[in-house]
Amino acid sequence: HLFEKLGVASDLTGRHKVGQGTVVFEKSSPSRLSRSDRGGELVRTAVKEAMSETGQTWKESPALVLRRGPYIVAAGLDFAGETTPVTLKGRFIPLFDAAQPVVHEYAVGVGARGLLVDLNRFPSDHIGVVAAACRVSNEKVTNQSVTFDAIGQADTNAVVSLLLPHAPKVVTIDSKALEADAVEFKDGILRLRFPNRAERIRVAVSR
């Protein structure tokens, strides 16, 4: 099906120009390549050849950084040795940090593991939840408010981060005002903290 969409023969092998890119296909089992001493080199060679066709340069890195939508998965290779860590720059919320801070640099060193929200991937006028240490559902954004339901494991703390252009007028949990020290607004991020419950909690942010 993929070859059909690309407009090439189904028995295609080798390297072929397709549109503005290059397709490389080798009839080798990925599982077999993973067990072969030469498997890694065969894959690297194929990728380098494809990149050369489009004027790209092969560059090795001591880290793997994958992006999907606003999310970044980052891992430092355990065998990277004394290499300089890869540093991501921007505006991120590291989801493995319970405090959900906003950081502008994130170092991916040897053995590091990170799951980040890239705030710069959201439209400049985006309003709403971008990270949460609970399950968020039924979110609704209007000119007057942001409302959503939250549910989580009992006896744990919920932390919810929202993009908001201005500090909120008031935040309520099940119609009761959230205490001031549980509400933090800085640099366009509203951070809420409240006890999780294993039942629906209604959160309302008045704008």
Regions of interest found by a model, annotated:
Residues 89-98, 162-177:
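Solvent-exposed beta-hairpin/edge-strand motifs
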Residues 1-143:
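A conserved amphipathic helix/loop scaffold
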Residues 137-162, 200:
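Beta-strand-rich recognition domains
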Residues 78-90, 151-167:
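Surface-exposed beta-strand/loop patches in extracellular or lumenal glycoproteins
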Residues 74, 148, 171:
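Hydrophobic, well-ordered secondary-structure elements that form the walls
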Residues 189-207:
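Surface-exposed interaction regions enriched in Ser/Thr/Asp/Glu
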Residues 106-110, 182-186, 193-197:
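Short proline/glycine- and polar residue-rich coil/turn motifs
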Residues 104-106, 137, 148-150, 190-194:
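Beta-strand-rich interaction surfaces with strong enrichment in secreted/lumenal proteins
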